Amino acid sequence: VYKDKLPNTTITKNYNYYIKQGNVTSKSVAIIFKVKNENNLNNFLDNINKLDIKINFFIDASWLSDNIEKAFEMTNMGYDIYNLGYDGKYDKKSINKSNNLIESITLKDSKYCLNEDKNDYEKEVCKKKKMLTILPTMVNPSILELRQNLVKGAIISYDLDTFDNSKINIILKTITSRGYMVKALNDVINEKRY
């Protein structure tokens, strides 16, 4: 009988690096949507609520503070919500406030920052709060880019403000037709061997 063993230096306790990809031993990917306002959100939630997939939302704290009930609704639907900072930026002054807001809704620790432009200052802010910094494998990929660059453990980010809701089914078919499953960010980053 073999026991599962994590690496000596586990990524979940090391905040110095960007996480560009999840576990490559599992054919799973994570899809992230950035939420900055409600323009596209209600239609999108109606659309994906009919599907059996796990979507991850990084929510702007400015929008969140005015839409706490909507965030509770998203959490109750089974979606994970995370801190996008203020206007997509993390700074020393406001990260505590936005983390407290997220944690009061999810009843979980805020543990991820989203950093699409590899901003080292923001990574350091997140590191001091013991938050892992996600640098997605793909940002707003077209269907062709998704087909060409899909790999085990991919973390795919879309901006919900500019996202075409009619494309979600094509995106999911592209992913699942290649044998991948869409999972929660926590599950994709998990270092356990599958």
Language-model features, listed with the residues they occupy:
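Metal-dependent polysaccharide deacetylase catalytic core of the NodB/CE4 family, i.e.
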Residues: 27, 38-39, 45, 49-156
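N-terminal pre-catalytic segment of deacetylase/amide-hydrolase enzymes
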Residues: 1-32, 37-46, 180-194
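Short amphipathic alpha-helical surface micro-motifs
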Residues: 12-15, 96-97, 164
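Catalytic grooves of carbohydrate-active enzymes
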Residues: 39-41, 146-188
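Short loop or secondary-structure boundary microenvironments that flank
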Residues: 35, 61, 161-162
